[in-house]
Every structure is written in structure tokens, then in C-alpha cells.
């Protein structure tokens, strides 16, 4: 890792770090149906980040040009084979929508509270900001692995279903959380992997003896 004031950074045209700039747009809706004990909330958003700071790929020297030769000497002097930098390398956009539905109802002698929350979000690469010095090295400056990590290494879908049943002093809590598929990439497409979505189940049983004493037993990730 080299800083942005180093000679390798100057030779590669890696600029000084500057502050990221972001623009946010958001809107929402909330509605209730009292007769059905139902409420709905929907929020949408778009976040544009300009000059986003990321870690570049690994640059190496060479023998083809004086610039490459100097980089090789500098790397050798630093006992390094490659160099990476933090840089304002990309512009990105994150867009998403959050939906929450809640419901309350009598069930037998007790009451059941139900909550369904879903998040659908995606981050996309809008532009790679390179200098003329980096012409031909764009795939190193921000490589394919970094792009996949940005766009699909975290779940783009998350759905959370919660049921909470209360009968006198007894409480039964159940939660299912679904995490959408994710990708793991290398710079070789043939080695890419996609991991399917996964559901995590939590279950607990609680009893309230008095205001100061309660007992709860349960399990997280019950089915794994």
C-alpha cells in the first residue's frame, strides 16, 4: 500500500484524495387501515456518490517504458512486488425501496402481532474516473472483482417476517429472515461463484413472572 503523495502514485497519475460528494433523493408513503389493524410504510431512495473512495487494484512495474522501469525500481526499493492506492476512482448509484407491513389481531385468548419488512436495494457502478496516464490500465485501477464486490457481494434483497404471540404472561416469538443471493468474483469469470439466498430462523419462548423477573429460552438460526 502506497500513499497518494508517493512517487509511484505520481507516475501512475493517481490524484490526491478529496472529499466524496453525494446527492440523495427519497420519498415515502404511510397508510393505515384501522378496521383491519393494518399499517403500511413504503420508502424509496436514490443515493448518488461522486468520486467515491475505493482501493485500487494492484499495479506493477515493467521494462517497456521509463515510467514502468522507475515504478519497478521503486517497488523493489520498498520490498514490494505491486502497489495499491486509495483513490476517488468511481461514481456509484444506490437505489432501493423499503416496505414494512404490520398487523395486530386477536388469536384465541391471546394477541398476535405480525410484521413483514422487505428491503430491495442495488448499487451500480456509474463511471470509472481515470486520468490520461492510466489509459490502458483501467482494468487494474478498478478491476472486475472490485466491481462485483461493489454491486453484488452483499444481498440485494432482505425480507424479515416476525410473529409475536402473547397470552397472559406467556410470549412466543418467531422470526424468519431471508437474505438474497450474493456473488463472489475473481478476475477469471470461470471461477466466479453465486451463493443462493438463505433463510435464518429464530424462535423463543418467554414467561413474565413479574415486572422484574422474566425467563426466555430460544434458539437463533434454529434450522442450521
Annotate each predicted stretch with a short phrase.
Residues 1-20, 25, 33-48, 61-62:
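Solvent-exposed loop/turn elements at secondary-structure boundaries
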Residues 11, 21-25, 93-97, 155-159, ...:
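Residues that define the transmembrane beta-barrel architecture of outer-membrane proteins
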Residues 17, 146-152, 189-196:
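Short, contiguous acidic/charged loop-to-helix segments that flank catalytic cores in large enzymes
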Residues 13-20, 87-92, 192-195:
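Outer-membrane beta-barrel proteins
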Residues 16, 26-30, 41-43, 88, ...:
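Outer-membrane beta-barrel architecture
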Residues 35-40, 109-112, 169-173, 211-217:
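Repeated loop/turn-to-beta-strand initiation elements of outer-membrane beta-barrel proteins
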Residues 45-50, 56-186:
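Gram-negative outer-membrane beta-barrel transporters
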Residues 122, 176-185, 206-224:
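C-terminal beta-signal and adjacent terminal beta-strands/loops
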